[in-house]
């Protein structure tokens, strides 16, 4: 039969590489879809697709298969993509749980982390105490960090450490994979949670690691198990299930594990093999539901019958065991029986062994892994049941296998039909993990295989494995008798005959006669929470948990430790368990099957397992007891086998959890390299042993003096999983320490223990006594192996491989070697039980097995034999590695097929000649150990060092990667660019790293040197990264502390500000109080003083104002040097006429000026007198200067005061002035006012051009010929000329109301007269049209339009004039005329009336006047009313007779307001033609009223 190996391309489909006996590579004719997995028959794969299409696909896929290194694979592999169905499932689940709509892009919607934190709290309330709802990036990261920690606290075993990074990098596929795992986990722990869609719709691409392990595990397993083994398959896991996953294989991602759905618990291993026939997805639900229900009922009845039969069989076995124990001497192993809650099957009810599943086989390559048949799309999970204390679910890929049909079932068997899964050399069986899916899902179509050729091949493939099952059966029943040893076949005949029949061919057995024996499915306990960062389990809908029954070990769950690497994650289900043999070799068992454990074989660590050792001891004991005809050679062989299979940790291991990782990182396993041990006995991947372990190590070293121990090997460390005897169950994680590198590189080699590493990378190991050996058992000395033979064997194996170019981890082949050592023991059992085998046959069988173990595909590169094969076995991520061991087993089995014992002996002898192996020299006791030793000693030394260097390189690479991830996770914004630059600098992808072709093409010494260079470089980088990480963490702590301190500072600053404000408020209040008191006191003093001096002050609005004073004092303040204020000058000049005449003011100023001339001192005066004189003269000069400035302002601003008499006095003052500068200054000011300016000089210049007048084309003859806008302009010019000529004195003392008003206010009276004239013009123009009402109405409209134009020109006086004319009694009574105008014009006129309304002291007018800009003409009636109010409301004199200067100040304010409008003229042009029509004599009011009566007579009243 051609062995086949699965290969997964990037598209997610399976293809099969068929390998014939000559190791030639040929591609199969079809591919298997990921949704319909099939069993290969004769190297082919059944598929419903077109052959041509498949062939073209295979050709394309052949080009796409990459042979890359482990490092390159981890760095460059693409993440498998979830299909849109899974996307919708996850999004709908999030919406149903949190009522939060997640839209695309998904990462952008999930970036705030609020919905994710809510999901965690829904799964386990109060897990996340605080959810940050802010929109800052810091809040997002805090929520995502809490979500990651929450996943760990609720028991989530997926590696969520990179979730935050994936979200911020918008890697939706990876994020959805992790969320899908969380969804399935929540369904598991929350039974009420309903899955959004059937899991069979899952369409996830499988990784190469997964497919390789699937093929390797099934290929190395045996098709049948013994009766006792079958009874234990559904009950308890073997110790291999709890063993530690190798670091390179413990990284199966959760996305890969979701590819396989859970299968029901197998109740019996005696079932018919079957194969899956692919079909479309549309047929997955609803084709065989009725048949499945019927089949389930039949199976339940069969299970009940089988249980009864098993109980009877168990009773018979117990009786036989008791009889044999009386006849036999005490066994050497501890027989503490483990109680298992399962039923056993009697010999009478045993069934013939079925042919094995036709799956790819492996021999010496990676450890047993799932078969192609095990890779199915989500078989229907069984409902969740209460866990049994003695049952656990093995975390294996084979747990996801759908059940096979019984012989009487139809092609589509029931979902819970058990499957006979191939077991390894330790008779492992598989159990279905827990599942919470309540909805059954149909699986692929199943048919039994009845071809004879397949039965033959499978039977031959698993001859040795049948005996392995016998060993396990001995362990399970703890009896060393013939019945247990020969309980291999499941027939009801004699045990020895069954063994002989099994050793021969089972090809003639009829499959139709084989019926499955069912047992009720067992309950699986839930998986505990993951502790430790970087640990992952598959994200399927059920949890995997190991339950251990041991005398010295308590039950403990076992989460999986994985790397913190993308795309290379292996679950614990696919991990390997390494067992040491007594000859310092490895035995490998999968963690996929479950078996009963003896109570004293509970030691579990990464380096050894006591189960396999105890099995081998039982086999040897049984052989010695049952087969009395065996000679000493046979005993020696058995003892050698015992030594081969009993290298393990002592039985007493600290049951307390110790999760101190020995690597720099805690988020991923440290290495996938060789498992090396330190001289003190503790593996680098395990915990340090206690004192008892050290004692056992010393005893074992004394017994096995020829063990291969290399103390100089670096102790590559991995998380130590031996908590409570259960592997893979860290209870916590320890912060990684850079000082642990010393334990890796600080171990010095001892010359006496120096030796080469074996082919599988076991560079150094500790000889440890088996935990199950009794004190009476004496150690059997081992013959030292021949170094030359071992490397010759390596060379033979290297030449025998034809296709392998990829590289796999050295851990895998070391495990495969261990499996083959177990096969040696099984062959010994076969020969001893049959009583016809002699010592030579026994030795030959062992040699044969060892040869098969060491067979490898040839590496075309020119690397040395041992290192090449070892390095090939170091990578576990590629597909082609699986086929090596399959072909080797196939050769061994084909040679043993259809032969009697003599033929078997001859063929084994021939193989012994062709394949000299290291294990052969140890197990057979061959003394040819020194052949060609001198030729290979240098090569083996280089290869040994090369293996160590490669392990170090890989170890350091992963530590460096983890450090980078931690740094980027801690502070990615700041340090991400730095590490990108660092990667460019070191050029990791372009350098010669671990297992590249450029490395393998060099000589071993060059390879070693390159590895040392990489090691030094990685060490330097790690030191740098460690320093950077420390700095980053310190910076983060400092930032946190800085933020806290900043908050404290802000709060203190806020409090400080509040205190300062309160202080300022109190201080201001106190200051005001003091100031008021001081001012009151000052006012009292000043007022008393000023009263005495003739001046009275008033304090108003924080300043002193002159309230009153005598006329002389008020004039004196004009030149007082101590009094400063220009406002006083203006107020005095505007209002002085109310209390003094201009002549009196001029006389006082002239007198004061003449009295303040400078005084000349004598030359004999002393300095002090001179200074006093100078100060006195300075004051006088200041008085002169102030008088001159006042006179200048008086002449410029109020020249109208200078009549003829006053002008003469002013000229006299100038003539008598002795200060020449002052005389010239005053004379120039007077000349400007006396000399009239020319017209050109008087012309004003405006910034804007003068608008052109609006004139009719024809000469103006009447009022209708003129435009209202131009009429408004001409009226404004006339009124402004009158307004600007009004002098300030005309507004004083109500001059316009006095008898001599014509003299005192001539210009003001002209303005008043003009107002009345225009108003009379408006009235008379309308009422004169007595006959034509239409014409009167048109006049009325034109005057309203004229008022609008005047308002636009800010001529408020004109607006008041028009409104006054139209509102007169003569016009207002003309109702018929007002009725002729439109409502719009009437409304407009009402607005003018409101503007001129005297309501609220003309508030509307005052407001619009303040808001006006440009030239304006105010309505003087309002301002004259204000002056009248001030004059009449205030007295001219104070009580003491002083002038009331406060009244003068109020009058000055009104006059100043009028003066502001006089300063800005209009930019208009005068039109002389229009003057006659807008100026006329006024018509008396009585006459106008009479004309109004003529226009509209009064209505008669009847």
Curated annotation (Swiss-Prot):
Chain segments carrying region Disordered: 216-242, 325-436, 456-534, 589-935
Bias-annotated ranges (Low complexity): 218-242, 325-345, 371-400, 407-421, 458-508, 589-646, 663-675, 686-719, 764-790, 813-853, 883-935
Biased composition (Polar residues): 422-436, 861-876
Residue stretches in coiled coil: 287-328, 451-515, 1032-1076
Calponin-homology (CH) domain ranges (all copies): 84-187
Alphabetized InterPro entries for the sequence: CH_dom (IPR001715), CH_dom_sf (IPR036872), Ras-like_GEF (IPR008937), Ras-like_Gua-exchang_fac_N (IPR000651), Ras_GEF_dom_sf (IPR023578), RASGEF_cat_dom (IPR001895), RASGEF_cat_dom_sf (IPR036964)
GO terms under cellular component: plasma membrane
SMART domains from the UniProt entry: CH (SM00033), RasGEF (SM00147), RasGEFN (SM00229)
A GO MF term: guanyl-nucleotide exchange factor activity
UniProt key word Coiled coil: yes
GO biological process: one example: Ras protein signal transduction
Record-annotated N-terminal Ras-GEF domain positions: 1102-1249
Biased composition, class Pro residues, residue ranges: 518-528
Keywords, comma-separated and alphabetical: Coiled coil, Guanine-nucleotide releasing factor
Ras-GEF domain: residues covered: 1267-1498
Chain's role: Promotes the exchange of Ras-bound GDP by GTP.
Entry protein name: Ras guanine nucleotide exchange factor P
Origin species: Dictyostelium discoideum (Social amoeba)
Phylogenetic classification of the source organism: Eukaryota, Amoebozoa, Evosea, Eumycetozoa, Dictyostelia
